Amino acid sequence: MNYQVTVSGDPELAQESVDFVSSGFGNMSMNVNTTSSHHHHHSNSGNAEVSFNGGFGMPNMTMEVKETHSGHHHHHSNGGNAEISINSGFGMPSMTMSVTDSNSGHHHHHHKESASVNLSLGGIVGAVVGAVTGGVMIDGRNRIWVQLNQSSYVGGDIISGTIEMDCIVPFFAKGVIVKVKGFERLWLQELRTETEGEGSNKRTVYKTIDHKENKEFFKSTIVVYPQAGTVNCGHYSFPFSYQLPSDLPGTFCHDGKDAMGAYSAKILYKCKATVDVAHKHDLKSTTKLIINEKCGELVQPSFAENKKSFMLTKGKLHVKTWLNKNAYFPGETLVAKMKANNTSIKPTRKISLVVHHTMQLKTRLYHRCITNAIYKQQYDGFQPCFYGKRYLPFSIPVDLKPSSSLGKHITSSYLLELECDIPMAIDLSVTLPLTLFAPQFLYSTVPSQPPGTPLPPDVSYRHPWEGDEHATACRKCNKGFSLFARKHHCRHCMKIFCDKCTSTKTTITKLAYPKPVRVCEECYPIATQGGNKYQSAKLMAAQYQASLNAYYAQYASLYPQIYPDQQQQQQQPSAPPQQY
């Protein structure tokens, strides 16, 4: 039997179905099993079951056909009707179609028969295409990714980039979209101890309570290509842009556990590129955005100072500390400049730089503050009566979490503490704020400076302190020291004399002695004029400049693209200006 099928409906949807089938997804096969009976001059009925087997992963579909017709003897015209019900196994609505067939009756002979089938499809083809594409997995060789114009952003910046796609195996797509979002997510575990019952039934119960908070900063969908159709083999680029809201908190992600319970704190920003195919089988790729807090007025030199007196010893210790900036990247090296004026005879055994990290985690019903000293680096101390400058290099660990202070539920902050370890006394500490940006490992392929760039030299304005253990007699009168003949240091030359030879006192302005101090008879005339410095800061700065120029000259020869003008003119860059 031959069937002539005519389809009426949306031609574009029909064409999409043809394109879909012709794109290499597979073939359909149809099996028809019919049973019928007829007898001379009697009405007859027959049933047919038609099954469609999809060769490309779609579920099977069955169709039941019920037909009735009357048969006549000896070549009379016959008429019959058929009602066909189609049940799909993949989400299509059921549909029916009517079949009218006309054939010539026969007796003991078989003749060619024909049937005309009219299908009014309308949206049926679209439903078939949608259901089939929803069930098809995208070939794993097809790729999509996000290419951004910057490695990091701050609130208010415009994110610009392209969606790059490589198509190896063609497929049908509805469009290309980009989703950008930023959110804050906090989970806190509270370990609570409660007492239940009374009297002899009183008991202690340990409970674990979970606290959760979520806040969405922004969420947007950008349609970069709205047209539907078959994606052929090749490479595609779709540009897009999006302006971030201002005053966004910095990227932060940290999970941990302490005595109060576990916690998970996340401030994340994501950019997701999607080729809209259907349902869960979209071709997609997600890229995390690095957002730093806007800090136009934050990056500036940082300064702090502190001083202390001693209970049983005259004099004070006054320490000033500078940072040329207070915002750094993990892995970067900061240099802390310290200027100390110790007018006492107390030495400082060692100097330490300690990084303290503080997290504030807040939910509606629970709050936790977590503070830890996460990194410490030690340096040599200084002698009694030290007056001078020290430069302390400090390499920031790469695994430190970034700062984030604008979140509603999560804040992360750092402090850099300089500690002076003083024997038999409370330590002196100076605290500086420290901001860490989110790490950027790809922002430059060339190092900003060659490794091992020389540091500014340490400067000591006063002479080195002479140790008591080697002095047995006065340097001038040779009087031996004993329990009753005590040792005294001249505050100008720092040598040891007896009490009589250091009986004169005067201020020494150039050595930061504003009050009268002991000096020997030889140093007294110079001390009254302000004194002489042990080392000249200007002379040492000139020597440092020369060594730095030589070092940068070597750097310019290795990386001429950084200093093209100096390379052409054979001039070397000067030392960076001292901002502190």
From Swiss-Prot:
The keyword Protease does not apply. Its main location: membrane. A zinc finger (FYVE-type) spans 468-528. Keywords: Glycoprotein, Membrane, Metal-binding, Transmembrane, Transmembrane helix, Zinc, Zinc-finger. The keyword Nucleus does not apply. Zn(2+) 1 binds at residues 474, 477, 498, 501. Gene3D superfamilies: 2.60.40.640, Zinc/RING finger domain, C3HC4 (zinc finger). It is a single-pass membrane protein. Belongs to the arrestin family. This is Arrestin domain-containing protein A. It comes from Dictyostelium discoideum. The gene is adcA.
